[in-house]
Amino acid sequence: MPGGGVTVKDVNQQEFVRALAAFLKKSGKLKVPDWVDIVKLAKHKELAPCDDNWFYIRAASTVRHLYLRGGVGVGSMIKIYGGRKRNGVCPSHFSVGSKNVARKVLQALEALKMVEKDPNGGRRLTPQGTRDLDRIAGQVAAASKKS
């Protein structure tokens, strides 16, 4: 592994997610749905995301989460990307994220062969996906060491 055995856990996570999103976008293989520019990411959100590359960032964040905890499915992903639903004068409650977005991200990552279905339920990283993530983590570590 480049970077002397650096893994995803060893680098700054925000920089890693940004680098992985750039890698996914540059590869051009991630299938992005047509509706990405008009969708909200959860029912508790008031507006659609401002960033045009949000699908790549969500995919990178999802892959990172699968690296840290394998066997995670769509149900777990919608809880991770959930948040506080503001109900005006009524008390706030937790609201889950969009199930369709979580499912489409996982399906797109499966098409890239980074993620596969786990026989015990959920999804897990493939060996190729783990290799790619460790390689990108090594690049992030080397870049942060230079600056």
From Swiss-Prot:
Localization, UniProt: Cytoplasm; Nucleus
Record GO terms (molecular function): RNA binding; structural constituent of ribosome
InterPro entries the record matches: Ribosomal_eS19, Ribosomal_eS19_CS, WH-like_DNA-bd_sf, WH_DNA-bd_sf
GO process terms (BP): ribosomal small subunit assembly; translation
Keywords annotated in UniProt: Cytoplasm, Nucleus, Ribonucleoprotein, Ribosomal protein
Pfam families: Ribosomal_S19e (PF01090)
Signal sequence bounds: none
Disulfide bridges in this chain: none
SUPFAM superfamilies in UniProt: Winged helix' DNA-binding domain (SSF46785)
Gene3D superfamilies cross-referenced by the UniProt entry: Winged helix-like DNA-binding domain superfamily/Winged helix DNA-binding domain
Gene Ontology cellular component annotations, sorted alphabetically: cytosolic small ribosomal subunit; nucleus
The UniProt record lists the keyword S-adenosyl-L-methionine: no
Described purpose of this protein according to its UniProt entry: Component of the small ribosomal subunit. The ribosome is a large ribonucleoprotein complex responsible for the synthesis of proteins in the cell. Required for pre-rRNA processing and maturation of 40S ribosomal subunits.
Protein family per UniProt: Belongs to the eukaryotic ribosomal protein eS19 family.
Protein's name according to its UniProt entry: Small ribosomal subunit protein eS19
Source species of the chain: Ictalurus punctatus
Organism placement in taxonomy: Eukaryota, Metazoa, Chordata, Craniata, Vertebrata
Gene from which this protein is expressed: rps19
